[in-house]
């Protein structure tokens, strides 16, 4: 079994660094059967996913990852990655909390994002 924790950590660092600098460069991480659920809205396929990420209404963002948890997820070598953290958008001084879950599947000696679920986490009222 490969070191799923190391793979999850490397993936997470790459994903958020790329997201924060040039979201279009995330396209190779997805496939036509990949799905993103962004705040309850589903997007299927690379073009729709990257289109959604590029149309987000901000230019500058900084993800601050707090936790990365990973588990092997199936017999074919998939990895479930759960990330929590905070993000700063544009000139905001107060970070917003988020959680994001990725299902990584192996293909051609690498991994791609099969499932991606993003959710902002608001304080309890």
Curated annotation (Swiss-Prot):
Summarizing the function annotation, the protein's role is: Facilitates protein transport into the nucleus. Could be part of a multicomponent system of cytosolic factors that assemble at the pore complex during nuclear import.
Question: Which InterPro entries does the protein's record reference?
Answer: NTF2, NTF2-like_dom_sf, NTF2_dom, Nuclear_transport_factor_2_euk
Places the protein is found? Cytoplasm
Q: For the NTF2 domain, which residue ranges apply?
A: 7-120
Q: One GO biological process from the UniProt record?
A: protein transport
Q: Which GO terms describe its cellular component?
A: cytoplasm
Protein name in UniProt: Nuclear transport factor 2
The scientific name of the source species is Davidiella tassiana
Q: What keyword terms does UniProt attach to this protein?
A: Allergen, Cytoplasm, Protein transport, Transport
Matches recorded under Pfam families: NTF2
């Amino acid at each position: 079994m490969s070191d799923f924790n190391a793979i999850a950590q490397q993936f997470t660092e790459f994903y958020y660094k790329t997201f924060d600098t040039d979201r279009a460069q995330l396209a190779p991480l997805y496939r036509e059967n990949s799905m993103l659920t962004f705040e309850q809205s589903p997007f299927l396929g690379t073009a729709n996913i990257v289109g959604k990420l590029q149309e987000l209404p901000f230019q500058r963002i900084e993800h601050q990852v707090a936790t990365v948890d990973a588990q092997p997820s199936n017999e074919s070598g998939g990895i479930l990655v759960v990330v929590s953290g905070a993000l700063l958008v544009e000139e905001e001084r107060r970070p917003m909390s988020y959680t994001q879950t990725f299902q990584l599947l192996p293909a051609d000696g690498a991994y791609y994002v099969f499932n991606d679920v993003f959710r902002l986490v608001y304080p309890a009222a």
